[in-house]
Amino acid sequence: MKNNNSTIAAHNNTPTLAISDNRGLAIRALAYNRIHTSDAPEELITRNRYNAVGQLIASRDARLDSDNFRYQYPLGGAALRTDGVDNGTSMQLTNIEGRPVMSLDAKGTRSWVTYEPELGRPLAHQQQPEGGQKTVTDRFFYGENSAEHKAANINGQCIRHYDTAGLQQVDSLSISGVALQQQRQLLTDTLGPVNWFGEEQSWASRLRRESFVTRCTTDILGQLITQTDAKGHTQRMAYNRAGQLSGSWLTIKNGAEQVIVKSLDYSAAGQKLREESGNSVVTEYRYEAETQRLIGIKTTRPAI
């Protein structure tokens, strides 16, 4: 109890205060801190400045006597240039629709994004380190207006994404957008640079033949009912009438189903009251009646 009281005393009279201007913008943040109970609280001030339209243009914390961050904006509103004492200078250009098209980080690495002219969906990401070669790091392909893709609910969705790890492919989606079947193929060369330049037909040799497939089933609300991973292990979930998790099970490939969560009880406010695990360990939660804040957790297990 003595240690607990000393911990409480160290936090006494150390509030965090926020000060706003007449536009509701946070212009000051005051934090008070002490290490030992005998120390006077140290005041730490963060100062923010805004332009006429309410955009943050500079921020200064308690470490320095100058700005930590400075921001410049174009007419579109997204930050055009950011200067930071820790992360250097970065810039980002957007198109008329607000989508990023080119960026430059503090290391001199340039990045570009190419979009479809009509729908604005991303088609490719390109990257060029300072003094290095320009490469295509990502390519995106979308479901076509075909009977096959409509049946799998992937019409117009991103179904193949070539990235720096290989190929991520979506085979079918639920009505709520949850991936029902997806697969991953990894690169054959994991050490060399990744460049998805050219036509898709020429990339097959860069990928390993093995595909890691994940399959799911969902309910009408889009919540997972079962999920089978690439190793063949299956998770199963159950829900109550309110859509809250009521139990879960795990089946290791070629094994028997095991109980992970045996039961769950909730309050009328949706807060977890009691959870019994598959090994019969019970965890109970208590909440303050007035504020509904968590005030206690008790875990018990049966005697061996």
Task: Please name every model-derived segment.
Residues M1-I304:
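Beta-strand elements of repeat-based all-beta scaffolds
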